[in-house]
Structure formats: C-alpha cells, structure tokens
Amino acid sequence: MNDFITETWLRANHTLSEGSEIHLPADARLTPSARELLESRRLRIKFLDPQGRLFVDDDEQQPQPVHGLTSSDTHPQACCELCRQPVVKKPDTLTHLTADKMVAKSDPRLGFRAALDSAIALTVWLQIELAEPWQPWLFDIRSRLGNIMRADAIDEPLAAQSIVGLNEDELHRLSHQPLRYLDHDHLVPEASHGRDAALLNLLRTKVRETETLAAQVFITRSFEVLRPDILQALNRLSSTVYVMMILSVAKHPLTVAQIQQRLGEKP
C-alpha cells in the first residue's frame, strides 16, 4: 500500500476503540487527520511488513523493528529467577517470564499466561467462525487480551480500554441488568440458543478460567491484590462475552448505539 491512509479509511476498517492496538502495512503513510485520530484514541500503532515483522515509528518517524508483544527493540540478558545468574544456554525446563527473567515451567504464573494464550486463540478462532456483526466485539476482545498479556509480561499498569465504545462500568451494568438494557433476561446456556451462543459461551468460560488462574497468582494468602487492573479487566471481559450471548438470543438485538442510548437514560 503506497497510498495515504485517511481518517475515513481508518474508521471503515478498524473499530478504533480507545487503548487498542492496530497493525498497518509497513509502507503505509498517514494523513495528518488520520494520525491525529489515532493519537486522540491512544491507539498503539504497529506496521507489518510482508515477512511478518513488526515496526514502530521513532520520534523521527523512522521505522524500528520491535518485539510483537512487548514493542521492545532490545534483547536484555535473561537471568534465572532462583539463582540470579545469567542463563547462557536455556534448558527445556526454563522459559521467559519477562525479557530479563527466566523461571521454571512449573511456575503458576506460566499457567495463568497459558490460559490467557488459549483465550486469545479461541477469540481468533471465533473471528473466523462468527458473522460480521460480532467482528468489532471480537476485535476489541482480542486486543484487550493482548494488552493484558503485554502488561503482565513487561510488568506495567494496564491502561483503560473500551469494547465497541463501551467502558468497563457500562459493560458491568449491562451484564447485571440485561432485561433493562438489552430486552432479554439472564440466561443459562442450552442447545436451543443456537450456534453463536454456544461458541460465545466457550469463550466466556475460557475467560472465566483465566480470571480464576490470575486470582491464584495475583491474590496473596493475606488477600493482598497484586494486579487489580488485570483481575478487573478479565472480569469485565467475561461480562462482555455474556452480553454478546444475550444479544445473540434476543428476538430483536439492539445495536451498540441503541445500547449506549439506554445506558444514558435516567432510571
């Protein structure tokens, strides 16, 4: 792609949910209004070349190759967490927890990360399996899961991020009062709900499983919560998929715009 990417093209091809990440062709050029839109939404932009390499712009707008997850362009020396010594040759029993720390593969934190990886894989599969109306939701869920993985891997706070324009508080309200906001009451999954609801329920349960594993890792025996941001994000993602399930079985499912209008109405 040698043409300029415009604001109109971005709106037509991406959800642009605040705090998410988008990939653009490596040779893409942005119009001033397109770049302003991306910056205003706090979007992380990466450029993808035909060989699958990811790049980011530096301050001089020169592309720099980076790691797909961490966005880092450096390769620090990794040390064993137990003995604090550099790992020259990595044994099969160790793996990276962070870029500079290796742990045994039995570490519970890796169990959480494996579940998170599975949730991402399932989301991608549903992006292929489900129809167009669900694509914006799934794109943002995939982005949110990736940002959770990144925040855990580089030990940074997890920024706020909306799903199809709905913030965490709104998603929480929808999942707790579906009859009021979505015209359908709470549901217990069953075959009569159909294929979409069944597939979405697989994702919901995988996200819940990931949340419980995160709780085992990030809540200490003295009930100190080490990563409340990650725990809340996973909880709200579970709520999000539950909302999608309810919309999938509703006789007349509401659009996001209609949902937002109802959320703004006074009781």
Curated annotation (Swiss-Prot):
It comes from the Bacteria. A divalent metal cation binds at C80, C83. Its EC number is 2.5.1.154. One of its GO terms (biological process) is ethanolamine catabolic process. Optimum pH is 7.0. Its cofactor is a divalent metal cation. This is Corrinoid adenosyltransferase EutT. It comes from Salmonella typhimurium (strain LT2 / SGSC1412 / ATCC 700720).
